[in-house]
């Protein structure tokens, strides 16, 4: 295949092809007519048992011999340990899969267990609680160490396979998995070929054998579920179990759940927008790309990318992976967000009962400003390109925020929010997509000590397909002439500076990526409509996103008004009326909601989204039969809608149809094993149906997984001491910049206040 790093050319390819033909031909001549598969399998099983028993003799079975891998959910095919030498190295796979190997080497998977910041964080856990607790992390960061029994007292701290992290033979040896996450996979002994009977061959296999039986190689290393999001959920979903924190179960990462409920999955009727086709994790993170070197896994000269492009900009910098760095930045900038500086609210807000004068949508209406004016900019940020939340996962150490700046005509900054301050720290009052994890002492877990979590004091993110409204109040200084520019930018860097400096053992500067940005110029004096830019949404969608953002900010009256503007512009758009009804339903105006749902159904009689919300209204009105009929229709159209199954199960329960209710909640658990409502209701249903053992099991799971009602006291005390975060934790707040202290408005708009 040529010297390492060499690009394939026709002459070299011919030499390679001839050499391979010779190798394969010689192997065929030397190969025995039959293989003693049974004896090989017996020998392999005996060797594995011997290794497992030897390992078990010195292993810390903290959670009992029946749960050797806790606090990870990982397990092996027969419960025995697997010799780490059974795992083929990535270099071995690279013989034939050069390009996949080269891409993998630069990926987060490859470096999952060797980057300094991860090792420092795990060492905190090892010192504080013991190495056996680190199985919780290593089940996904270093699976070979977990299933080989290496994470116990007295075992070597440095292992050769650590440098490969999640290597080829890890993912391609997983036999099955489920959506509990935290390493919820079943690992088998790696094999790169199966025999004539389809049984794995665990002995070393030559390249020639593989090339002679590519079909048997494929059967050994590929499974259909590797192409599903459920496969990824084994690690890209996680919880903090009692076995780790000595407290109770807490959700940590819910990427799979977020995807499954989004429009990208097309498994739920509830998203605000509809995608044309299904996108899985692999669709975005393993896009097919043109082959550059050589790889026998390529099809039609294209290869499923093994870079797993995401958001880690630090690994490429640490190891000098320039191509990966450029590709990650490109990925982060690829139409993930739409930023819309949607409105300007004129006047101060000292009188909270006063409806403000609002110019919206900016660029399409005329308005006036003057030097000395106090303005509040309404910035709408739409998550249109991510199939999960931004920022995803635990969020405590990741850092993404909104930078907002007002400049005069000469480019001088008049006021701003979200600047990087001395030492690399972010402005503490910036609007950030992050959270705050609080421990039992009411203190911040600022080094990702998730094993000490008790409560999340603050949690801000934008889910897939949703929008968020960020408001900034500022004053145009007296004497300003010409114009001012207003710029809003979503920025991203991998970690906050405090965690990164800890992780690297020194101050370490990280790349900062501008994911999306918009600038609007406001004239001092008259402002007239302008031609929309190429990246701007259509007017109806701008109003729609504004309405979604207001809805999530619990500003129901304003949200209804925004959605009504959509209905005026698109009278044939059924979801406009459904959206009005959703806001009215949350506002507890059930009669009004019902009327708008009927308008929507007149336009789209089979809309599962509208039928779902009509069912909720009907049930609230006491019409259970009608509600059940609508929900049954929804479930037929969306059999994996967790919301529909949950509500249908409760409706059956209200009618004492316990068997039907049980079926719905069991179906719900097949989609989400940790659904809290399913645990609670099944604990009641099983008891009423005489299944007392199952009832007790579900009751115990509910008790473990429900939030601790007293934990909020830690959060309240922390917020009391951190006023900058207390303000951020209020869903409807204003970032007050260069203006005197003001009282926030009761609402942003009124029917008569908009231009």
Descriptions of predicted regions:
Residues 540, 574-575, 608-609, 642-643, ...:
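Helix-start (N-cap) detector for alpha-helical repeat units in TPR-like alpha-solenoids
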Residues 690-698, 707-713, 721-739:
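Alpha-helical linker/edge segments of TPR/alpha-solenoid repeat scaffolds
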Residues 36-84, 100-133, 149-464, 471-480, ...:
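Primarily the internal scaffold of c-type cytochrome electron-transfer domains
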Residues 569, 603, 637-638, 670-671, ...:
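Structural marker of alpha-solenoid helical repeat scaffolds
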Residues 553-565, 572, 586-599, 606-609, ...:
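Structural signature of tandem alpha-helical TPR/SEL1-like repeats
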Residues 666, 670, 676, 680-711:
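TPR/TPR-like (Sel1-like) alpha-helical repeat modules
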